[in-house]
Design a protein with these regions (language model features):
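Short, conserved beta-strand element in jelly-roll/cupin
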Residues: 44-61, 65
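Short acidic-glycine-tyrosine-enriched beta hairpin
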Residues: 51, 63-89
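A short, N-terminal "cap"/entry segment at the start of jelly-roll beta-barrel domains
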Residues: 1-39, 174
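Cytosol/nucleoplasm-facing, intrinsically disordered, low-complexity tails
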Residues: 1-11, 23-25, 91-101, 110-114, ...
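Double-stranded beta-helix
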Residues: 94-185
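C-terminal non-catalytic accessory extensions
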Residues: 188-240
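Short, surface-exposed beta-strand-loop junctions and turns on beta-sheet-rich folds
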Residues: 60, 67-69, 97, 108
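Conserved short histidine dyad/triad with adjacent acidic residue
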Residues: 24-47, 74-83
Length: 240
């Protein structure tokens, strides 16, 4: 697939409407239109620090135990740092009001952020097309089985992407750790959450390996970005 066939700007419709702009290397510009219910989901990174810069509008951010509302006002565009292993998520502060624009970037800047969003959206937007593809076995399944297939296929592919591109979801978050006052209990619960998340993603990775699934696919990724990512993987394996 050529670069021209892989868009740098990807839009998903309401109610969880969002626009991902990967036009500038090293950052992803995320736009949330009015009334969007989009939520990043609670997660953490283990090999990257992340930076969230609020360019327009107001967002609600959870970072560790803190919850804050951050606005871009009068030309001020605040940026917050999300250190490795810090649980975090963000969304619009309110459904009404102007559109929200946030720039996400990571350090080290290896372009994994853009590759993550290209492939995440590729899976989410293209998997349902299998149902109408006459060459696909899935299109011949009964409607109930088609729904079951998508409910399994999409999360499986996403979990493989999460595992390989440093985006670890918090699957449990019960009880909410911020409400646990005992430090030893909180530490134990967080370790349990960490083990559960890694175990789920590892099982998904094994299942994906058996099925021949890849976290980064050329059909969803611009050719130059794919080649660079693939080269890094080869070099990493040689170094290991």
């Amino acid at each position: 697939m050529t670069d021209q066939k892989v868009p740098n700007v990807i839009e998903r419709p309401l109610p969880n409407g969002v626009i991902y702009d990967m036009s500038t290397v090293g950052r992803v510009r995320i736009t949330l239109p009015e009334s969007s219910t989009w939520l990043s989901g609670l997660h953490w990174h283990e090999t990257h620090d992340e930076y969230l810069k609020v360019v327009r509008g107001t967002v609600r951010v959870r970072l560790g135990d803190s919850r804050q509302v951050i606005s871009a006002v009068n030309g001020n565009q605040p940026e917050i740092k999300v250190p490795c292993y810090a649980w975090h998520e963000w969304q619009r502060a309110a459904p009404e009001g102007e559109e929200v624009v946030v720039i996400e970037r990571i350090e080290p800047d290896d372009n994994d952020k853009a590759i993550f969003f290209w492939n995440l959206n590729g899976v989410i937007l293209n998997s349902p097309k299998l149902l109408s593809d006459e060459t696909s076995i899935v299109s011949r399944l009964p409607a109930r089985l088609q729904g079951l297939f998508l409910d399994t296929w999409i999360p499986l592919n996403l979990f493989i992407i999460f595992r390989s591109l440093d985006n670890i979801p918090v699957f449990l978050n019960a009880p909410n750790l911020s409400r646990v006052s005992d430090q030893r209990l909180r530490s134990l619960l967080q370790k349990i959450h960490t083990v559960v998340s890694h175990l789920i993603l590892l099982v998904a990775l094994w299942a994906g390996w058996l099925l021949g699934l890849q976290p980064v696919q050329l059909k969803y990724t611009p050719g130059d970005a794919y080649a660079t990512w693939k080269s890094r993987q080869v070099n990493f394996k040689k170094a290991a």
